[in-house]
Amino acid sequence: MRPTKEQAKDNRQRILDTAAKLFRENGIHAVGVDAVMKGAGLTHGGFYGHFKSKSDLAEQALAHAMQNMLGADALSGSLDDFAESYLSPEHRAAAGAGCTVAALGPELARLPEAERGPVTDHIRGLIAHMENWQTQSGSKPDRSQAIADVASFVGALVLSRTVNDPALSDEILESVRNRVTGKA
């Protein structure tokens, strides 16, 4: 029996959520369609009813994940709140649920230019949020500083996940968090 339109919509959402998580945890190229469908609790045969290809799935899943981050509660608070959340041991440990750019940056950079539009839009959105936080704190928006702050956040998360020294990993997060929030 064919799923109802509502079931099909729910299935598609589960596929997108599962793919976004698995891609961020393992990398796009390391995750196959079978793993995504199994993780979503669906059969492989249903995949092509939702997506043209794995590339189509990757593009949509990553856009979905990045859009969810820009709409997240963390972005509705203050810069200090965002820094505490983004530059935290919990976020560091949760690559599958965290920042797509920090989890997949080098892999995203190797995507064809035509497929990097959602990533570019996401980064522009993060920069805009940084500029908005500058305004909220009484400062004049400084795009250059906003770009540097976004790069600092992403870079700190990447480095903290890369090193094999837990104390250094924590120090990286804390140093950038303190610098960005003015607590240094």
Region locations from a protein language model:
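N-terminal intrinsically disordered/low-complexity leader segments
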Residues: 1-8
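Hydrophobic/aromatic-rich alpha-helical bundle segments in the mid-to-C-terminal region
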Residues: 112-121, 134-184
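Helix-turn-helix
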Residues: 14, 18-56
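An amphipathic alpha-helix signature
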Residues: 16, 124-131, 143
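Amphipathic alpha-helical segments enriched in hydrophobic/aromatic and basic residues
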Residues: 4, 23, 32-33, 44, ...
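Amphipathic alpha-helical segments that line or abut small-molecule/effector binding pockets
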Residues: 17, 80-92, 106, 147, ...
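Amphipathic alpha-helical segments used for helix-helix packing
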Residues: 81, 93-120
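Hydrophobic alpha-helical connector segments
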Residues: 70-98, 136
